[in-house]
A protein has these predicted regions:
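Cell-envelope/ECM-targeting effectors and their regulatory/trafficking segments
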Residues: 1-161
Length: 161
């Protein structure tokens, strides 16, 4: 008697997107919000122009990273800020921007407001997103905390409605 093994399929979080000078829109706005949250003075306009490029290079230098002006996995990982209910500011705006971009708020008529306040609506949207991820990737916690795994899933575009 022979036993055949079924092929193992393991879902994983999509890789971080590479973002560089000249890119526009998503996820440049999120990048700009995170740079602002790290103290860089720039306008969130969705354009990765000279000002954003300079802020990225400065951030990379401050963090001891390779200074190439390209936002890849190492820079994203250093840039993200864990946020949860009660958090406020530009990092929260970055999360909310991701939800708006992909219509992940769960409400087809009203997107999540980008107001920088991690309140009940943002918490519900985050938990719903995490629950959807958890179905395919059981290691994803459904805790309402936007940490490294949830940030990566958001920025890389794991789900859209």
């Amino acid at each position: 008697m022979s036993i055949q093994e079924e092929p193992m399929t393991t879902a994983a979080i999509s890789p971080w997107l590479l973002v560089r000078e000249g890119d526009q829109q998503h996820p440049v706005q999120t990048l700009q919000y995170l740079l602002r949250a790290r103290g860089h003075n720039l306008t969130v306009d969705g354009i990765f122009g000279p000002v954003t490029a300079a802020a990225v290079r400065t951030f990379q230098q401050q963090e001891g990273l390779a200074v190439d002006g390209i936002v890849g996995p190492v820079t994203w990982s250093a840039l993200i800020i864990t946020v949860q209910q009660g958090s406020q500011g530009d990092a929260v705006r970055g999360v909310q921007e991701e939800f708006q971009f992909r219509n992940l708020s769960g409400d087809p008529n009203q997107g999540l407001q980008v107001d920088g306040i991690f309140g009940p609506q943002t918490d519900a949207a985050v938990r719903g997103f995490q629950q959807a991820l958890h179905q395919d990737i059981p290691s994803v916690a459904v805790d309402g905390i936007v940490g490294p795994v949830t940030w990566q899933a958001l920025v890389s575009g794991m789900l859209s409605f």
